[in-house]
C-alpha cells in the first residue's frame, strides 16, 4: 500500500487551489480567525501560515480557526497533513488521500469521519467527538490512534498491526482484540464495557489503563516491560503480576474483588493503590521503592512494612488491623489508620508525622459537679483507638 501511495502522482497546484477554495466556502471561511490571502491569486505558498505547500505536498494547520460545517478533501492526493482540532464541524471526508500521514480533528463535534484509502496514515487523533463508527481497514501503517470520548460500540483494528499507541477510552466498547501485538507500547481503554481483556504477548507494553470497565479477566502474560498498570473499578478476583513484577512502578487496582495480591519481586514499585477490595493480608516486604500506599477499605488483619524504607504516605483505614508497625519506615510522614481495631499507646516516634489520622480511645468532656458546682473533666473509653502517655488522667489527647 505504501509503495502504491508513494508512486501516485499528487494533484497539481491548480487542483489543490480548487480544493482549498471549496474548503473555504464549505466551512465559512469569511468568519475564520486566520484567512490571510486565502482565495487570492497569490501562490499557495503565500496563503498564510495555515497553508504549507511544497514539492507538490499540502499541509493544513486550521486548529481553533472557527471552521463550521463539513470538511471535504476527498481525492486530494497532495494532502499529507491536516490539523483542524477545536472547530465546530459536522463531518470530515479525507477518503482517497493516499499520501495523508497525519490527521488531528480532536474536539470538533463531528459525527462522521471517512479515512478510506488513506494508505499512508500513521497518526489519527479524533477524540472528543460524536463518532459511532470508524473504518480503519485501509490504514495498515497506523501507529497512533487516539479516539477517546466518542460513542463507538465497536472498534476494528485488525488491519492496524503497526499500532504502538492506542487510546480508545470512554466509549461503549464491549470487546477489544489486542493479543499478540508485540509493538504496542501504551493502551488506554478505560471507561468502556469490556468484560475480558487479553493482552498476552504484548511484549512492548509499558503502560495500561483499563480502569472503569466490567473486567472479570485480565491476561497480562508475556507483558514483560509493563511498568504502570491501572485496572481500578472492575470485577477482578485475581491479578497476576509475575511476568512484569521487576519493572512495575505504579499499580492502581482499587475497586475490585481481590482477596490476595502477590507483590513479591516488585522492587521498583513506588505507588500502590489497592483500596476497596477484599484483601485479608498485605505483604509489602521488600518494596524498597514504595513511596505511596493506599490499602483502605479491605479486610486486612495484618500488613507488613518491613523493608519499605522509602514509604512516605500510608492509608490503611477501614480494615481489621489490631496493630501497625512503622519502625521500618523512617521517611513516613502521613499515616491514615482510622476505623480499625487498633488499641495502642502512641509512641514518641509518631511525633514526626505531619498527618496522623487515627481513632481516639478517650473522648473528653466537661461536666459540673452536682454537689460543688465546679467543672471537671470526664472521659469515655471507646475501647479501641490510640492514646498518648498519661491519658486519661491528664484529661486531654496530646503529648
Regions found by a protein language model. Name each.
Residues 58-62, 82-84, 101-105, 122-126, ...:
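Conserved hydrophobic beta-strand positions in leucine-rich repeat
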Residues 70-71, 92, 113, 134, ...:
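Canonical leucine-rich repeat
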Residues 395-399:
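Extracytoplasmic Gram-positive cell-surface binding/anchoring modules and repeats
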Residues 294-296, 301, 305-348:
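Ankyrin-repeat and related helical/solenoid repeat scaffolds used for protein-protein interactions
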Residues 76-79, 97-100, 118-121, 139-142, ...:
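Leucine-rich repeat
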Residues 65, 87, 108, 129, ...:
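Consensus "Asn ladder" position of solenoid repeat domains
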Residues 1-81, 98, 119, 140, ...:
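N-terminal capping/linker segments that flank leucine-rich repeat
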Residues 77-80, 90, 101, 111, ...:
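Threonine-centered tandem repeat motifs in low-complexity domains
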Amino acid at each position: 500500500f505504501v509503495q502504491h501511495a508513494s508512486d501516485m502522482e499528487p494533484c497539481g497546484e491548480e487542483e489543490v487551489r480548487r480544493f482549498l477554495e471549496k474548503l473555504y466556502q464549505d466551512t465559512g471561511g469569511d468568519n475564520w480567525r486566520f484567512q490571510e490571502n486565502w482565495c487570492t491569486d497569490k501562490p499557495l505558498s503565500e496563503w498564510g501560515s495555515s497553508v504549507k505547500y511544497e514539492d507538490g505536498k499540502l499541509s493544513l494547520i486550521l486548529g481553533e480557526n472557527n471552521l463550521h460545517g463539513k470538511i471535504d478533501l476527498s481525492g486530494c492526493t497532495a494532502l499529507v497533513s491536516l490539523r483542524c482540532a477545536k472547530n465546530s464541524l459536522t463531518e470530515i471526508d479525507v477518503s482517497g488521500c493516499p499520501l495523508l500521514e497525519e490527521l488531528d480533528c480532536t474536539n470538533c463535534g463531528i459525527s462522521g469521519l471517512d479515512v478510506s484509502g488513506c494508505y499512508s496514515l500513521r497518526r489519527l487523533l479524533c477524540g472528543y467527538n460524536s463518532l459511532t463508527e470508524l473504518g480503519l481497514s485501509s490504514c495498515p501503517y497506523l501507529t497512533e490512534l487516539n479516539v477517546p470520548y466518542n460513542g463507538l460500540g465497536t472498534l476494528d483494528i485488525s488491519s492496524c498491526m503497526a499500532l504502538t499507541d492506542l487510546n480508545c477510552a470512554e466509549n461503549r466498547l464491549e470487546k477489544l482484540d489486542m493479543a499478540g501485538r508485540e509493538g504496542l507500547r501504551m493502551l488506554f481503554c478505560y471507561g468502556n464495557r469490556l468484560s475480558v481483556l487479553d493482552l498476552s504477548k504484548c511484549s512492548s507494553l509499558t503502560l495500561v489503563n483499563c480502569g472503569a470497565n466490567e473486567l472479570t479477566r485480565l491476561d497480562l502474560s508475556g507483558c514483560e516491560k509493563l511498568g504502570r498498570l491501572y485496572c481500578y473499578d472492575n470485577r477482578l478476583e485475581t491479578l497476576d503480576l509475575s511476568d512484569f513484577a521487576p519493572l512495575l512502578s505504579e499499580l492502581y487496582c482499587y475497586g475490585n474483588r481481590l482477596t490476595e495480591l502477590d507483590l513479591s519481586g516488585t522492587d521498583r514499585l513506588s505507588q500502590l493503590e489497592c483500596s476497596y477490595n477484599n484483601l485479608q493480608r498485605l505483604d509489602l516486604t521488600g518494596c524498597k521503592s514504595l513511596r505511596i500506599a493506599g490499602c483502605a477499605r479491605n479486610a486486612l488483619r495484618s500488613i507488613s512494612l518491613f523493608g519499605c524504607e522509602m514509604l512516605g504516605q500510608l492509608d490503611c483505614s477501614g480494615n481489621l488491623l489490631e496493630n501497625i508497625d512503622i519502625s521500618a519506615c523512617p521517611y513516613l510522614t502521613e499515616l491514615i489508620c482510622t476505623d480499625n481495631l487498633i488499641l495502642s499507646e502512641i509512641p514518641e516516634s509518631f511525633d514526626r508525622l505531619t498527618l496522623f489520622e487515627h481513632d481516639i480511645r478517650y473522648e473528653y468532656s466537661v461536666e459540673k459537679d452536682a454537689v460543688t458546682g465546679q467543672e471537671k473533666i470526664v472521659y469515655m473509653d471507646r475501647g479501641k483507638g490510640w492514646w498518648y502517655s498519661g491519658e486519661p488522667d491528664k484529661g486531654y489527647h496530646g503529648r
